[in-house]
Every structure is written in C-alpha cells, then in structure tokens.
Amino acid sequence: MVSGLINENPIIYPKKERRLRTDTSITDELTPEPIDQLEIFDHIRDIKDPEHPNTLEDLRVVTEDSVEVDDENSYVRVTFTPTVEHCSMATVIGLCVRVKLLRSLPSRYKIDIRVAPGSHATEDALNKQLNDKERVAAALENPNLVEMVDECLPSEE
C-alpha cells in the first residue's frame, strides 16, 4: 500500500456475479477456444488497486463493458477509469492490466490499454506511455515497479 492516499475514501461497488462458461460447441481438443470479453474481464477483475485493499472491479476501475475483444484479429482493448482524475497510480494500474494479460493470453494478441476519455488529467500521455513497447519494457526492468505490479496481481489458482 502507498502512504498519503490520493483518494482516501473511494466508492466500493458490489461485485458482479461470476458467470460460468457454458460454450460446449468446440469439441475438438486441437481447436483453440475463442477468447471473449468475459474471459478477459475474468483475468483482470481481481487485480488489486495499488493504493487500496480493493480490486479494480470493486472500485469500477474496470468493468466487463470496458473490455473489447476481436478474437479473429487477435486484438484486446481494455479501457480503465481511475477513481480520481489526478490519480498518480494510473500508470501502475495500466501496467498491472497489461502484465496480467501478457501472462494470460497467447502471444499473438495485441493488447491495447487505455484510460477512459476524460477520466484523467494526463490521459493522452498515459495512453501513449501504456502502449509504447519500449517504455513498458523499461518499466518492467525496474525491480521496485515489478514488485509493486506483482503485489497487485491475483495469485494464480
């Protein structure tokens, strides 16, 4: 947790009920299962906020509707909404989402992480930073930042 909270009293929302995957149309074990919006949301919903003991879903930083998937073109976009427009943790949140998806999805997927329009004071700079491969790689070479990201990611079951 970070001292000197940016948002001392965030609104905590009820969690959405988890839906079970029921698609049994693919019976061939060699055929890859399509990836959909719900699967992506399930990967990121339990990421912890770097500042609070709550998940990104609890704080509505991410919602199922904030996920777009084009499985045919191997493209995923997650648009997240920081709890305050001057959130200093927005870069860390975006990096957590990216790392979780990089670890969870096949490497063929292009992952696009965005801040919701109008939700952050430095929206354009954040979007550029979160989608610049060299900046992301440099960030992931920083052991302190990697430790912070790993602390936010849910443990694998």
From Swiss-Prot:
UniProt keyword Acetylation, yes or no: no
GO BP of this protein: chromosome segregation; DNA metabolic process; intrachromosomal DNA recombination; iron-sulfur cluster assembly; polarity specification of adaxial/abaxial axis; protein maturation; regulation of cell cycle; regulation of cell population proliferation
Disruption phenotype annotation: Embryonic lethality when homozygous.
InterPro entries xrefs: FSCA_dom_sf, MIP18, MIP18-like
Protein name, entry field: Protein AE7
Family: Belongs to the MIP18 family.
Gene3D superfamilies per the UniProt record, alphabetical: 6.10.250.1280, Fe-S cluster assembly (FSCA) (3.30.300.130)
Record's function text: Central member of the cytosolic iron-sulfur (Fe-S) protein assembly (CIA) pathway. Involved in leaf polarity formation. Promotes leaf adaxial identity. May play a role in the cell cycle progression and is required for cell proliferation.
Keyword Glycosyltransferase carried by entry: no
Coiled coil: none
Annotated localization: Nucleus; Cytoplasm
